[in-house]
Amino acid sequence: MLGRRGAALALLGTGKMCFGLGYILTPHPDPRGLELLTRFAGIRYWAVLWVVCGAAAFGSAWLRIGRDRWGFIAALLPPFVWGAAFLWGSLAGDFPRGLAIFGWYATSHIGIILWAAAVPEYEMPHLARRERA
């Protein structure tokens, strides 16, 4: 059975794989704002990053706490890379909307992943003084 961290990794991994597959399976994916990345490889190659990292996050969902850290690192990689590319496009003036997309990646992806990585698997309630004695 998955704990809290495992459930987060399973959801994050599934979402990342779906996002990457959306770019891979679309006949003509739109890479606007990602020119920093597409200089080095096509958008479908960068979409594979989402699929591979999503699979790693999903697979890490069933590992024990402490061993699941690589799943959280894998989950961070695609939104960090793509968010940086959108920020670059915005700062360069090529894609003004990139700043908003960067903010979205920073909060709803990276922020949530960092929060989920810090969630303890089990929380023990604090005992009242009378219960401790």
Residue ranges and their predicted role:
Residues G33-W50:
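A loop-to-helix transmembrane entry motif
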